[in-house]
Amino acid sequence: CIRDRFVFNLCIFGGLAGAGIFTAQFYGKDDHNGVRDTMRAKYYIALGSVALFLLVFVLFGENLISAFLHEGNEGLDLGATLGHAKDYIAVMYFQMLPFAVTQVYSSTLRETGETMLPMKAGIAAVLVNLVFNYILIFGKFGAPALGVVGAAIATVLSRFVECAIVITWTHRHKERNRFIVGVYETMRVPPELARQIVRLGAPLLINELLWSGGMAMLNQCYSMRGLEVVSACNISSTVSNLFLCAALSMGNTVAIIVGQLLGAGELERAVDEDRKLIAFSVALSTCVGIVMALLAPLLPQLYNTSGSVKQMASDMLWVSAAMMPFNAFTNTCYFTLRSGGKTLSLIHISEPTRLDVIS
């Protein structure tokens, strides 16, 4: 279920990224009408993605779940697990729309230089999710113990809270967010801009779809190695994602700064700033990787699982730590190419390596 949601989330990100290239450039040359047009285009992309994934999950949801369940997982009640997964997804349908709308607003805010509000809204969503997970999973404060369904409800609530915060703040600060004034007077997108967004955005969407699908296939391969491997992978990925935030945030920084400079026509400055940001990102991620390597034997001890799983998770964390500088370099290069509109090259670079790993 988590991997299916992961594919959906990345497809939303990839789909909106094409319009986001133009958002940053329009904002860089102070063209707020252009920003409004790209925001409207994002709505069509986001809502279309929601409709497509809802259709896929409704028609093929059970088959997608079953791909990660097989007889090789000792001690696992496949029927019960499938039932819990279906119950979870049935509730999670309701988080798709608020998540999509949130990304339309948050991505536009980031591309226009406002990065703090989306972060604060995300933190609020995490806190709401944690609190309601505790209440609804375990039945605290008089609430029923809903287990897996409770976890799904908590996630849905957190998505609505995040969406409400982002929308409310954006519309209350119209002097700062001038693009929001009149954005809903029409939902028309200029045909030429729409064609350019499709031309540049389609490769990004395809790239994210293939990449997330490849990661889901990789995890399906891990699931065939047994529950211990799956548990170790989950621990490793959870911890690694915390440390990866540094590299990922630098990628977004590159997209915003370089995109705005390109929009303002300052090519030489864009090249200079990009080189500095790439170097800083690699240096920062190297330091983060060293810290991660030092903590690799300790962090898995926080989990209530077997010693072999903890050791396997530690080994995976060491590998992830060693790759931190390389991840930072490729991530910032990815956003550099994206901000300059070289989106087709991203598929040529990333997908052959992804297929090699899976094969």
Located regions from the model:
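Short alpha-helical transmembrane segments in multi-pass integral membrane proteins
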Residues: 23-95, 143-201, 258-323, 359
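Single conserved hydrophobic/aromatic residue that forms the stacking wall/gate
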Residues: 1-2, 347-351, 355-358
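Transmembrane helical elements of multi-pass membrane transporters/channels
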Residues: 91, 102, 125, 158-162, ...
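Helix-loop-helix hairpin linking two adjacent transmembrane segments in secondary transporters
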Residues: 98, 106, 121-163
